[in-house]
Amino acid sequence: QDVPIAITAVTEQLQDATIRNIADLSAFAPNVIIGETSVRARGSAITLRGINSSESDKSLDPKILVELDGVAIGTNSGQIIENFDLERIEILRGPQGTLFGKNTNGGVIRVMRSRPTGEFGGKVEMTIGDNGQEEFRALINTPIVEDILALKVFGTTIKNDGHIYNTFLKVDGPKKDYTNYGATFLFTPNDKFEALLTIEQYDDGSDVGAWTNEND
């Protein structure tokens, strides 16, 4: 059964526009504002059709769901993940509870990364700038068992010293120190079955703003 949904899909523009995370999407979709909160590591502040989801307390459910490779990220924290291998992003505006369950009053943002290709190859990107800006991104694809098991290894590290001088503490800030790395396995023993497994970790030691509990 066909279900009418207001959807914006971004594909070819991802690499051309250097889109690395969902916060870079605001210029590519109508009625969408996406930013990063200052009180949660990689926390998102998303507005779709006037409905805002920027809860800083992890005990509060977001009103807009973010999916990464089909897996829901249950809180706003960690939703602004830096990715080097984005393949497609879909923005579904309006309530999506029938198809996606809870936390979808405002809509759903689906982020899909590239799958292992089964062929050997890769890409590397480096950026160096002012204020100690250092960015390194890498991705490698390789077959393990030809036409059956493929592997993709990826990693990102971003560091900078910040661009604001704190006259009280006598230091620059806010500093950024972010690392994300992992591996994805694609198992296709035949034409009727496939299994995709991703193992990854990300660490964010970046400076964040002051925080107070909204329930106090």
Task: Give the location of each predicted region.
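Extracytoplasmic beta-strand/coil segments of soluble accessory domains associated
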Residues: A23, A27-V71
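Short acidic/polar hinge/loop motifs at secondary-structure boundaries
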Residues: S56-D57, K63-I64, D69-P95, M112
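N-terminal periplasmic "start-of-domain" segments of outer-membrane beta-barrel proteins
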Residues: Q1-A17, R42-T47, I64, T117
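Transmembrane beta-barrel architecture of outer-membrane proteins
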Residues: A17, G43, K63, G106, ...
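N-terminal periplasmic accessory domains that precede
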Residues: A45-T47, I91, N103-M126, E134-I140
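Short beta-strands and strand-coil junctions in structured, solvent-facing domains, enriched
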Residues: D16, I33-G35, S54-S56, I73-T75, ...
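Surface-exposed loop/turn segments flanking beta-strands in extracellular/periplasmic regions
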Residues: N215-D216
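Transmembrane beta-barrel wall of Gram-negative outer-membrane proteins
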Residues: G121-K123, I128-N160, I164, F168-G209
